[in-house]
Structures are given as C-alpha cells and as structure tokens.
C-alpha cells in the first residue's frame, strides 16, 4: 500500500516537473530569439561604419594578410598562404542571418591572385540547426599548377622532423568537417571582425603575454608567501626549542 502511494506521488510530481521545465525551455528560446532580433538591429546600424572601415582597409597593403596571420590561432598557417593572402583586398561578414546565428564569409582577392587560383571571390555560408553546423554554400577553388598551399601542408605533415604543425587557411573552404584545426569562420565572426586593427598591430599578442605574466607573477607571490609562512613556522619552532632548553636549565639548578 505504502509502495503504491509512493509510486503515485513520484509520477505525479515528476509529471508537473516536466511541464514546468518545458515552460522554462520555451522562455529560454523566446529570450534567445529576442536577443537575436536586438543583435540584428545593431548589426544593421553598424553596416555604414563597416563600409567606411573597409574603404580605409583597402588603402593599407596586406592588411588582411597581416591581421589573419597575427591571430594566435592562425599563426601556424603555411608561408604559401601568406603569399596568396597578400592579395586579399576585402573580407566581408554577414552575421546572424537568421535566428539560429547563420553566417556568410566572403574573401575577395585582387587580379594578381590569378597566378595562384580562380575564382577570385571565395564564399562560405554556414547555417545552424539544433546546434548542428551545416555548410550550404562553399566556393570550390581551382588552383594553378604548383600553387596549391594545401599540397605544402600535406608535405609538412609527412615530414616527421617537422615539430611545428602547419595547416592552410584555405582548408576551411570545404563542406567537410575539419578535425584538429581552428574554425576560421568562428574566429573571424567572433574575434577578428569586430576589431581587426588590434590583431594587425599585434596588440592581442601583448594582451595574452600580460595575462600569462600576471598569472606567473601571482604564482610566484603565492610561492613567496608559502616560503615566508614556512620561515615563520621555523622561527616559532626555534623559539619553542629555546624556551624548552631554558626551562631544562632552571630545573637542573
């Protein structure tokens, strides 16, 4: 009888728990959609500023090549990439294209890049569905003979003496899922796009160095504090030993 009552109340409360939890999840979804709508509004307001910024960037030779290679996660790209990226005249991002946060990234190269590849405009469009990434558009690159940087990557990976892993940023232009490589799209949309000048000037590297230095400095301080505590404990032990010796001498007298 008691077991039956226990089971009844268990399922009764479990049923209402599930209902409440679903209501919470629905509110979370609604909140995410409203946040996305606000983000879209401000993205729209930023467009004229991004266009002005792009006009300035196009007057700086090699801006995007230097910006991309100075990002810590992209510092290991093969040198052949830099030769091609030096002709990258425009990088464009269309972000938050729907409520799931889909985005499109476009690389536009100058005419001199024809000696390496065609076409000169590379596009990758990524969508999300239930947190699953799906590539719905990706330009297929046609490399000129002997100019494919991915071939250089293959050579480096086969070199057992090469301790530094190398990869090509152009490997990202694929519909396949990349393993053990940075997600170029996420790096651009989340970090580089919003303030490329800081990467171009190498300021982000200094920030990381400062953070590492602060952590090491804090660790050293902790070690010094521990050493000081140990010294204080030793001094107290010495004082106690001295008092014990003095008491023993008095007793002997």
From Swiss-Prot:
Domain of life: Eukaryota
One cellular component (GO) term of this entry: nucleus
Residue span of region Disordered: 211-253
Listed InterPro entries: NAP-like_sf, NAP_family, p53_tetramer_sf
Hydrolase in keyword set: no
Signal peptide: 1-22
One GO BP: nucleosome assembly
Keyword line: Malaria, Signal
UniProt cross-references to PANTHER family, sorted A to Z: TESTIS-SPECIFIC Y-ENCODED PROTEIN (PTHR11875)
Homology family: Belongs to the nucleosome assembly protein (NAP) family.
Other noteworthy facts: This protein is coded on the reverse strand of a histidine-rich protein.
Protein name stated in the entry: Aspartic acid-rich protein
Species of the source: Plasmodium falciparum (isolate fcm17 / Senegal)
Source taxonomy: Eukaryota, Sar, Alveolata, Apicomplexa, Aconoidasida
